[in-house]
Amino acid sequence: EMQRSLVGSEMCIRDSRMAFLFLQYIITILLLVLSLYFGKQLNFLLSTPPGYRTEGILRAELFHENNNHLVREEEADRNKRAARYSYIKQQLNECPYIEMWMNSHPSILRGSSFCTLLNDKDTRQNMLTLFPSPNFFHLYDLKVLEGEIPQKFESWSDYKIILNKAAMKAMGYARMEDAFVRSESPLWITFRNGEMEEGGTKLMPVVAVIDDYYPAHLTQGVKPMAFVVGKEDVSGDFIIATKPGKEKEVMELLRKIEKEVYNTEEFNHSWLTDEVSDLYSEDRETAHIYSVFALIAIAISCLGLFGLSLFDIRQRYREIAIRKVNGAGMKDLYLLLFRKYIKVIGGAFIVAVPLSYYLIHIYTRTFIMKAPVGIGIYFIALLVILLISLGTLIWQIHKAANIDPAKIIKSE
């Protein structure tokens, strides 16, 4: 009776350990799949072209003065300020390492706002709106689908409207010639003869249509965008497109200019490649966190598997000895000892697959652009778990399969 109680107790301990190992495998496979997916998602985000030029684009604050013509100042001070600005422009124009440059308040990722525009049927659409100069489209290599980017403007109050493809679709236009839009509120305000004039509230023809690009994080997708294009800014940041491989030389020139004009080599600047990279800093952190936890889970599972298998296989030495006496080969013994763990891994995999798919779906449900889950990450996760488990078990199974039956039976 006592022997039966001991056997039952051992079986209970073994079953509880197997259940714990089963749970460990579910967590490990789950974390491994999530780690693989978020790594895939990060690679997808970084490798998908944003729709505009990113290489060699520098945003720099070179002019450290108030360029507002409404601010009162002495004529001598105004002339000195204008001379400094002209000198900076001259140096940039003469630099052989610069393809082109412009002054601009908005950049490809900054300076946008939301405005409500209406078409000729008064259909409203809240869309991202920028106020760039004509050079904006050329500098960022934005593709023009219809029309032309305007170059001539009669005055500072002369603005033209350009839409992207998504905005044309949102407004219900198939052709540029049919497209007319106006703003619900003034887009610009000018003063003429002492009176204030509000602009942009009357229907204006769309003069060009550009291809869509991603104005923010890729997962937000493309957005309807309007570009209110006017004369080139004489204020704002300097946006500089360098020739390939000449970024270092351009930076040296800019430091030299700042030293000559303001007696300092320090100025705020950022490369567009870095700005785009910063958009995905949280995605990098997420992928890194899941990778770390997946490695920890794998290590814990290996320890759990090692401890359980050490206990379990030693309990089966007598069974192994009898099977060897009855003619069981090494292959049969390997299958016998590994079969139980294969079932545990298989069961855990069956549970972890739908659970991981559901978690990925919940996390990415608001993403417009995302990497497909794909069967590949599940295959890789299963393969990794099998190889690691086999590596953990192989030494003990090999040792058990090579025992001397006579010694085991004699000890029994």
Where are these regions (language model features)?
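Hydrophobic secondary-structure segments that place a key small or acidic residue at a functional site
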Residues: 125-222
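Intracellular coupling helices
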Residues: 8-10, 303-343, 402-411
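Transmembrane alpha-helical interface segments in multi-pass membrane proteins
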Residues: 297, 318-364, 379-380, 384
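Single conserved hydrophobic/aromatic residue that forms the stacking wall/gate
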Residues: 1-8, 12-13
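Membrane-proximal extracellular/periplasmic loop immediately following the first transmembrane helix
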Residues: 39, 43-119, 123-124, 129
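Conserved transmembrane alpha-helices of multi-pass membrane proteins
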Residues: 14-19, 23, 291, 368-395, ...
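Hydrophobic alpha-helical transmembrane segments of multi-pass inner-membrane transport and secretion
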Residues: 17-41, 284-318, 346-347, 351, ...
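"Rare, low-scoring activations can occur
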Residues: 83-84, 88-96, 165-166, 188-287, ...
